[in-house]
Amino acid sequence: MIKINKVDVNDLEVLSKIDIDNFEDAWTKEMFKSELEHPNAEYYGLFNDEEMIGFCGGWLVSDEYQINKIVIDKPHQNKKLGQIFFTYVMQVLKTKGVKKALVEVRVSNMPAITVYEKSGFATIDIRKNYYKNNGENAYVMVRDFSNEQF
């Protein structure tokens, strides 16, 4: 059964493994630990029964949420889980009073861009040479919740 729960530093090992398995520029365990211990960190895990199969997280500062990581593990991709998960996280953020959510995404990552656009995000800027491992540009995308109804 699919479920979504908050995650924290106790989930460090599995978060790190999913990140390494899915990204060339994955974070180290130390980076994850620092991120998860930050007072503004809000991370959510997507679980299939007891197995974490994805996560989304970032910083909640005032009424803005900066998405730092979102991933669905490769064996579970292309099953609409990313869209369902991301939509749920956005609803949770709205209930917490978030007015704006921001994310940077590789310009080549069309699956992620599609999820973001279907979730109400729009591209507002391009960060040149944003990704250190290959110099790829990133789109800056934003969703403004301030005029949305619940």
Give names to the regions the model predicted:
Residues 79, 83, 127-130, 137-139, ...:
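Acyl-donor (CoA/ACP) binding surface of acyl/acetyltransferases
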Residues 104, 117, 122-138:
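Conserved catalytic-core motifs of GNAT/GCN5-like acyltransferases
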Residues 2-4:
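Extreme N-terminal starter segment of soluble prokaryotic enzymes
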Residues 34, 108, 131:
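Positions that flank functional sites
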Residues 9-75, 86-88, 92, 96, ...:
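Acetyl-CoA-dependent GNAT
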Residues 41, 100-106, 135-143:
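Conserved catalytic core of the tyrosine transesterase superfamily
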Residues 73-87, 94-96, 100, 106-114, ...:
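Conserved glycine-rich acetyl-CoA-binding loop
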